[in-house]
Swiss-Prot record:
Active site residues per record: D652 (proton acceptor)
Cellular compartments per GO CC: external side of plasma membrane; plasma membrane
Protein name per Swiss-Prot or TrEMBL: Wall-associated receptor kinase 17
Enzyme class: transferase
Source organism per UniProt: Zea mays (Maize)
Residues binding ATP: L533, G534, R535, G536, G537, Q538, G539, T540, V541, K555
Sites where a glycan is attached: N171, N234, N346, N354, N380
UniProt record similarity statement: Belongs to the protein kinase superfamily. Ser/Thr protein kinase family.
Signal sequence range: 1-42
Positions with biased composition (Basic and acidic residues): 823-832
Coiled-coil intervals, chain numbering: none
Length: 856
């Protein structure tokens, strides 16, 4: 019995009383079991293994039974029964070119349970358009009708009537024909139709978005064809994330992951495709035992007997009567001990059942008469005792002589030619004998030992199960209450209200989803270390896979300020409406955890920081990439500052917060430090937050956050792209460990070229490099009001992109780089025409940056 942990103990007097009510019978059961006679052998207590198909087992290549086999074990002796091994040694069965994981093989029942993909499955995207069919059925179309077929011809398998055909989706009709022989003119037909009134579904499959087509009449079918059509064209059920599917399912399995008392959205209702099991019957060959040559099945069934397959074609090997096991292997058939189980034998007294090889015998207690079998004469409690000739003189009736009479009551004695029977009067029980139990009105009833053991085990299992269920129910209720409290505390009700407002205003295409804690726990494999994408100052980011196979990034923050709940909810609602190609899309959040979780779209190609500073990258960034990434980032920031519904200041712009997708398109991420600015304000006052090296010195001094703080941080990113150096580096001299300050000083001295990455300078040319450097210096101005707006920065970068594209088109190439002294002299002259920072401004910036330079 599992120990009762403190976590599952109910709180309060009433709950403790309920727990005691469960625990007392359990204690009594344990006492009863501990007092049983120790003479009972452990093997007599063993219960036969019960393996319902509804419990997942998954066969491995090491325990797959004959007639199935692998090449490493000499393979199977029969065609079609060979299996292969998966990555984790799971047994895989090949049928028609597809591999199916084997869950269970029944030798005695001649069936195999496999995990099967849907016959057809179509899901819908955010615009209600169907995605490509992911089913395994062979597809063909004629007019408006689409047919899916599947044939098991040439294999030892047939479709089992232990399955059901499931039709899932809105307003769908499923019609299927099963053929005993492919092309049969009299197929077996089954069908069902679904309707839809809402996008919610209960745990039942009775026609509302789900129906089951029975297969009870399908026996021995080798092929089938299926049509799966819409019955209406109203579009219900074609919303983002919903699916329509038709699939086989073991009729012992449930269609859904929840009970019939719950109601859930359609998109989360189905079992995952890899969890659906179907049953296939199997048989050897296609002829009966009589039609098969005797030496063939004598060779295959030499450890058992041949019987015709119940599916109609082929034959099977069975163990002889009284034996059970695997008749396809040597010593596979083992004698059944019928005496262990009351239902396996026919004895009146179970303790007088004697097991024999291939059978058993029954007997009666001493001095009872009968054959001992329940369906025979049984055992008569009226005892028959033969009397020896010495006790019964010739012609004398023993019952007439009290000294010779063995019965308690003389008148209930019967002497039949020397055989004396004793009985008890009506209403009394016993054997009626003087030297036996006699006769009494309330004789103690003696139960056989196995009956006592059985009752004790049942009592113990029942009470243990009851206690476990009660504990589980208490834990589930406590967990639900805690999650509801966290949901309320984290602003869940307020956020639901905001999302409802957005939807009512016709902006639902931008609204996000509120995920449950269980959904995200499953998506991240319980927040496995292997799913971590990165760690930062704000928290940890995990890779998650939702039930519809959408890959997402889930951010788990370190801390959460409960006093800022309303502001957090407002910002979530705002971010959920941001629709810009260069901003990572917020898909939703979870408020049922101690710290809220944010769910973003997954960007696969890492961060700009990794691509800039990884010298061994397989595809280094070109100057064209750098210009485009910078322009895209600037355009996204300009959108956040001015074009979104409420201006948003990111507050932590840096190269590691700029993600790149597979085409190196920039995406701004990590809005954990972001703040929205009311339209009637130019700044907000807040605690200092950001990353050293990117942090605006003016914001650092005044705590006043403005849009120009993002401009400064973006200027540092431009400096990174030019120099390929990190914002803070101990490798540089102490007075220039800050890249921003270092770049400004070099620019004003006309010595910028010595810090620009050589291959960037060669590819971009001096004019482009100086133009970007000038823009970076303007962004790094110590006075925020003199920095350009992000709209201006984005415009300049777009113009530089066009200029670079034109230069490449006409084949203009930069001249060879001259001697460093000539370069410096030339650009010192050019820099006089470029507005530079005054020496006082540089000094001010240096003093501000000096406070942060200690971080070097």
């Amino acid at each position: 019995m599992p120990s009762r942990s403190p976590a599952c103990r109910p709180r309060g007097r009433n709950r403790r009383s309920a727990a005691d009510a469960v625990a007392r019978p359990l204690a009594l059961a344990l006492i009863l079991v501990s007092t049983l006679p120790r003479a009972a052998h452990s093997q007599d207590l063993a219960l036969p293994p019960v393996q319902p198909r509804g419990v997942r087992r998954t066969m491995t290549c090491d325990n797959i039974p004959e007639p199935f086999g692998t090449r490493s074990r000499g393979a199977s002796r029969l065609p079609g029964f060979e299996v292969t091994c998966g990555p984790n040694r799971e047994a895989m069965l090949s049928i028609g070119g597809d591999a199916y994981m084997i869950d269970f093989v029944s030798v005695s029942g001649s069936y195999v349970v496999v995990f099967a993909e849907p016959i057809t499955q179509v899901c819908y995207d955010g615009k209600g358009k169907p995605t490509p069919d992911t089913g395994t059925g062979a597809k063909s179309s004629e007019g408006t009708t689409t047919t899916f077929t599947w044939s098991l011809e040439g294999t030892p398998f047939t479709f089992s009537k232990s399955n059901k055909l499931v039709n899932f989706g809105c307003n769908r009709t499923l019609m299927a024909n099963f053929f005993i022989v492919p092309g049969d003119s009299s197929p077996l037909y089954t069908s069902c139709t679904t309707t839809c009134n809402t996008l919610q579904i209960s745990g039942s499959c009775l026609g509302e978005a789900c129906c089951e087509a029975p297969m009870d009449q399908v026996n021995g079918a080798k092929a089938f064809s299926l049509s799966f059509e819409r019955t209406t064209a109203n579009g219900t059920g074609e919303e983002d994330g919903t699916c329509s599917a038709a699939f086989f399912l073991d009729k012992d399995e449930t269609v859904f992951t929840f009970s019939g008392d719950e109601v859930r959205p359609l998109k989360t209702a189905l079992l995952p495709p890899g969890e659906r099991r179907m049953v296939l019957d199997w048989a050897i060959g296609s002829t009966s035992c009589e039609q098969t040559q005797s030496y063939t099945f004598e060779k295959l069934c030499k450890y058992g007997t041949c019987v015709d397959a119940p599916t109609g074609a082929g034959y099977l090997c069975k163990c002889p009567s009284g034996y059970d096991g695997n008749p396809y292997v040597s010593d596979g058939c083992q004698d059944i001990n019928e005496c262990r189980n009351y239902n396996s034998n026919n004895c009146t007294y179970q303790n007088l059942c004697n097991n024999t090889l291939g059978g058993y015998t029954c007997s009666c207690p001493e001095n009872n008469i009968g054959d001992g079998y329940r369906t025979g004469t049984g055992c008569n409690t009226t005892l028959a005792t033969p009397v020896s000739p010495s006790q019964q003189p010739q012609g004398i009736n023993v019952c007439d002589h009290p000294e010779k009479n063995p019965c308690t009551y003389i008148k209930y004695c019967i002497d039949l030619e020397g055989v004396v029977s004793c009985a008890c009067p009506e209403g009394m029980s016993g054997d009626g004998r003087k030297n036996g139990r006699g006769c009494c009105f309330s004789c103690q009833k003696h139960f056989p030992l196995d009956t006592v053991l059985g009752v004790s085990l049942v009592l113990m299992v029942t009470t243990t199960t009851a206690a476990s269920c009660y504990c589980w129910a208490v834990k589930k209720r406590e967990l639900g209450r805690k999650r509801a409290e966290l949901f309320r505390k984290n602003g869940g009700l307020l956020l639901q209200q905001r999302f409802s407002t957005i939807t009512s205003q016709g902006e639902d295409q931008y609204s996000s989803k509120i995920f449950s804690a269980e959904e995200l726990k499953a998506a991240t494999d319980n927040y496995s270390e292997s799913r971590i994408l990165g760690r930062g100052g704000q928290g940890t980011v995990y890779k998650g896979i939702l039930p519809d196979q959408t890959v997402v990034a889930i951010k788990k923050s370190k801390v959460f300020d409960e006093s800022q709940v309303e502001q957090f909810v407002n910002e979530i609602a705002i971010l959920s409406q941001i629709d810009h190609p260069n901003v990572v899309k917020l898909l939703g959040c979870c408020l049922e955890t101690q710290v809220p979780l944010l769910v973003y779209e997954f960007i696969s190609n890492g961060t700009l920081f990794q691509h800039i500073h990884n010298r061994n990258a397989t595809r280094p960034l070109t100057w064209e990439d750098c210009l485009r990434i910078a322009a895209e980032t600037a355009d996204a920031l300009a959108y956040l500052h001015s074009a979104s519904s409420i201006p948003i200041i990111h507050r932590d712009i840096k190269s590691s917060n700029i993600l790149l997708d597979g085409n190196f398109v920039a995406k701004i991420a990590d809005f954990g430090a972001s703040r929205s600015v009311p339209f009637d304000q130019t700044h907000i006052t807040t605690l200092i937050q950001g990353t050293i090296g990117y942090l605006d010195p003016e914001y650092f001094q005044s705590s006043q956050l403005t849009e120009k703080s993002d401009v400064y941080s973006f200027g540092v990113v431009l400096a990174e792209l030019l120099t390929r150096q990190k914002p803070i580096s101990a490798a540089r001299p102490e007075d220039s460990c800050n890249l921003a300050m270092h770049l400004v000083v070099l620019f004003n001295k006309g010595r910028l070229l010595q810090e620009i990455e050589p291959h960037i300078l060669a590819e971009a040319g001096e004019d482009q490099c100086y133009a970007v450097a000038e823009l970076s210096v303007r962004c790094l101005n110590v006075k925020g009001e003199e920095r350009p707006a992000m709209v201006v920065v984005a415009s300049v970068l777009q113009e530089l992109r066009r200029s670079f594209t034109i230069d490449q088109a006409v084949g203009i190439k930069d001249e060879s780089i001259q001697e460093n002294s000539e370069q410096e002299e030339k650009h010192l002259h050019e820099s006089r025409s470029i507005p530079s920072l005054q020496s006082s401004e540089v000094s001010t910036q240096c003093s501000m940056e000096a406070k942060m330079s200690s971080f070097c």
